[in-house]
Swiss-Prot record:
This is Uncharacterized protein YmgJ.
Length: 61
């Protein structure tokens, strides 16, 4: 489970570092805020998207 979480975190870093506000707020803080404020259903769909994205990266590489 921790491995899956770390993969998702890496993907979040990749996604959010492309955005300008990434410099102001650290990715971890931003992710924690999302976890606290977003509904669980949105979290799940977002997490699934991250997993699919990771899978696509692994396949393409």
């Amino acid at each position: 489970m921790s491995r899956r979480y770390s993969l998702a975190t890496i993907t979040l870093v990749i996604l959010f570092c492309g955005r300008p506000h990434c410099r102001k707020i650290s990715v971890r803080q931003y992710y924690q805020k999302r976890v606290i404020f977003y509904p669980t259903t949105l979290q799940r769909t977002a997490f699934k998207k991250y997993l699919f994205l990771i899978r696509d990266i692994i396949i393409s590489s």
